[in-house]
Amino acid sequence: MKSARKFLLALSVVLLPVLALGAVAPGKAPAKAAAKPAPAAKGVTFTDITAASGVKFTHNSGRSGKKYLPESLGSGVALFDADGDGWLDILLINGRDWDPKGRTSLPALYHNNHDGTFTNVIRGSGLDVQMYGMGVAVADYDNDGREDVYVTSLDGDRLFHNEGGGKFKDVTAASGIRNASFGTSAAWLDYDRDGKVDLFVANYVQWSRDKDLWCSLDGAIKSYCTPESYKGTGSKLYRNLGGGKFEDVSQKAGVGDPTSKSLGVAVLDYNGDGWPDLFVANDTQPNKLYRNQGNGTFKDEALEAGVAFSEEGTARGAMGVDAADYDRSGRPHLLVGNFTNEMLALYHNEGGGVFVDEAPSSTVGQVSLLTLTFGVFFFDYDLDGLPDILAANGHLEEEINRVQPRIQYKEPPLLFRNLGNGKFATAAVGSAFARPMVARGAAYGDLDNDGDLDVVFTTNHGPAVVFRNDGGNRNHWLRVKTVGTRSNRDGLGTVVRVTSAGGKQWTLVRTGSSYCSQSEIAPTFGLGPDKVVQTLELEWPSGTRQRFTNLPANQVVTVDETKGIVGAGVGVVKAK
């Protein structure tokens, strides 16, 4: 976020020129002209099906003219199978009024009816709790085969245990989780590889209604303050002790820096040592790259790696984040959504613990310069085997155009198609997808079980939007669901590798990423024209390794860590 940040930027350039050396690509300079949009993959369209689907959700930011900081941020969305019927449901997080107005603002849990429609079943689900919710993370923390839900909230975070049948129970008090801070994004991961998933919670700033500050864009009218105005606060790491109990190990583990102002978190293994690391996006503070040392502690390597600052040596307004191997180099790279006039960051993992920001010299940076990006992720929307980029955009101030004519409050999302060899081009996938909105959370998953990946956006103080992917499944695909036995039940931290005639791909099974949201856990591999997966290999956190050969495309494969493939063919469809 940004107000009078020019002084800070100038000061950073003078005092910190050496800090960003790891982030500068030698010999590279920003291109002089933006690249022309390239056509999308043939026949792929994102169709707005919100009205037809029955999703009728409007986010309540609580805004009433007082310009409280949280009102500008918005909440997230999770796509997961809440009731175990094999279809993704939609959980939309909500805020609330600051003062009672005789209405109740609840989250929404949309049950998938298996026919392209959804029904809100929040009432009586146990998730029907009024709170000023922000983010959501989903995983099976007790290894009982059902997905549990963690919600960050200004009223105190909540942990909901999945009781089965789409019913949940608030177990926060009994769990030992006590995050009373300004929680935003969260991620489940088994950082100590003991077979039980732990919880990382990103916290933002020290804010309360009675300590809200007065800020202005023009010196006359109150506007939303930027995070520079508030002190930071430490994020939290809760170790799963088993039996539904958690222990706060934030300080002991080395991830509780009190100066942080965190909005996004991504789980990755950037050095390939088999231990899950964390990248934390900070707003006007240096980003964090926590290297898992394999002994219960982490070390921040962001400065040395070149991901703490921009290449000018300043901390950007970082919000959403994701990680993926977009160029088949065998290493995960980082994507970060930033503030207006800061562009997306696309940190390429060079190996040896060093990253280079490729965005300034690429279409990704040029096109995203003026947008303000919250939700971001890599996903293969056209199933050609190359991860593409989506950015959900929208400004904080409704009046921003009055003081910055080139900047708009509502902004269209950006979709960058991966052309191979590390190159991206903007993609046109229908007029509805290009509609400006005040987007915040963003998640992807196969809502209709047809193979390709659909998208859900949340908007701040506005409606949720559901986009169906039409035509992505003209290419072939394989989805892999992992069921841990020695490892955690969800298989989080498992490396999945796929080889077909078109080459090799891999990913890490994980949660988190984007902004305050969670996408489908089971990874989907695009295969392009390939109809057969030659090899499917899994490396589990326990050390178990599995290898399967000659699997037909266009199916969901369920792999049990002990038994091997226990289900295949569920969701098989013919490419359209």
Map each language-model feature to its residues.
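Beta-propeller blade termini
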Residues: 74-84, 111, 132-146, 161, ...
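Repeat-based blade/solenoid architectures
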Residues: 55-76, 103, 125-137, 176-187, ...
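Asp-box/WD-like beta-propeller blade repeats and closely related beta-sheet repeat scaffolds
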Residues: 122-141, 146, 151-191, 201-228, ...
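Short, conserved, GDST-rich strand-edge loop motifs in beta-rich repeat architectures
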Residues: 93-104, 203-230, 391-409
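Hydrophobic beta-strand segments that make up the repeating blades of beta-propeller
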Residues: 87-94, 144-153, 199-203, 277-282, ...
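Blade-edge beta-strand/turn elements of extracellular beta-propeller
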Residues: 46-49, 117-126, 167-177, 244-256, ...
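Gly/Ser/Thr/Pro-enriched helix-cap/hinge segments flanking short amphipathic alpha-helices
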Residues: 23-36, 42-45, 53, 63, ...
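Beta-propeller blade signature
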Residues: 107-112, 233-240, 291, 348-349, ...
